[in-house]
Amino acid sequence: MKVVFMGSSEFSLPAFEALVSADSYDVVAVYTKAPKPAGRGYALTKTPVHICAEGKGIPVRSPVSLRAEGEESIMAEYAPDVIVVVSYGLMLPKWTLTASRMGCVNIHPSLLPRWRGAAPMQHAILSGDTVTGVTIMQINEFMDAGDIYLQEVTEIGEKENILDLSRRLSVMGSRMLLKVLDSIGSIQPIKQDESGVTIANKLEEFRIDFEEAADVICRRIRALYPKMYFMLDGSRVRVLEAESYEFAEMNIGDVINNELHIRCGGNTALVPLVVQQESKKPCDIKSFLCRFRGKSMPVVS
């Protein structure tokens, strides 16, 4: 079976590698996002999928847009039996849906129709979902609304962050993808239940709002790891791990038994466990607080 693979992020890699390793599939081309400046030197950096595909000698295309002139003709030359799309990052024009014999098959890291959109895993953690999963679906012209070939469920660990969950679901999805492709001609996909739709828009606010309840902040820290931060004496401090509890009385920024207890909304407190101050390495909270020994604790904001 001739496959065109579309993917860009680390999440895409297990599926790509599974397809390349399987004897039944011939990955004839890879589509991935164009290299972009990254790092301190702003050097042009290729996506993980781009690097992996080049190492395997597979042709790579990285158009800025699939709507550009000539893209449809180029795809036709590859004559794929199926197009597999996993965390690609570009909008698919309508012509891609009919560019292969079996259409476009997608790995989506949620139990559709719950959490359609760009950040399904983040929203699952943030909302306190205890289970999530992976959906293998047929792409149609609407966002994450295609018919479902296969779903599998998994629990979300109590302390699992987005990186851990993403790694697990990417491996889970790669196994499910092969299972679907091996029998795609005999599987009858199921339509999604539109009454159960929830939307997972991209989350882009990373400063901790201490007006929120501390348990919500803890979920946000896990969902957006390692980006959530507070300000301390003009410096950003990322919170990488934290706990929460309810309290009777305390002051904002109390230090109790070498722990920082931060008052939050709803009579709750946040206790950072692992933090990273700007330009410094991550450390446990006791090591962090040693920097202020003999000094008054700056205001947390």
Curated annotation (Swiss-Prot):
Keywords: Protein biosynthesis, Transferase
CDD domains, A to Z: FMT_core_Met-tRNA-FMT_N, Met_tRNA_FMT_C
Catalytic activity: L-methionyl-tRNA(fMet) + (6R)-10-formyltetrahydrofolate = N-formyl-L-methionyl-tRNA(fMet) + (6S)-5,6,7,8-tetrahydrofolate + H(+)
Disulfide cysteine pairs (residue numbers): none
Binding site for (6S)-5,6,7,8-tetrahydrofolate: 110-113
Stored InterPro entries: Fmt (IPR005794), Formyl_trans_C (IPR005793), Formyl_transf_N (IPR002376), Formyl_transf_N_sf (IPR036477), Formyl_transferase-like_C_sf (IPR011034), Met-tRNA-FMT_C (IPR044135), Met-tRNA-FMT_N (IPR041711)
EC nos: 2.1.2.9
Top EC group: transferase
GO MF annotations in UniProt: methionyl-tRNA formyltransferase activity
Function of the protein: Attaches a formyl group to the free amino group of methionyl-tRNA(fMet). The formyl group appears to play a dual role in the initiator identity of N-formylmethionyl-tRNA by promoting its recognition by IF2 and preventing the misappropriation of this tRNA by the elongation apparatus.
PANTHER family named among the record's database cross-references: METHIONYL-TRNA FORMYLTRANSFERASE, METHIONYL-TRNA FORMYLTRANSFERASE, MITOCHONDRIAL
Family per similarity comment: Belongs to the Fmt family.
Protein name (database record): Methionyl-tRNA formyltransferase
Organism: Anaplasma phagocytophilum (strain HZ)
GN (gene name): fmt
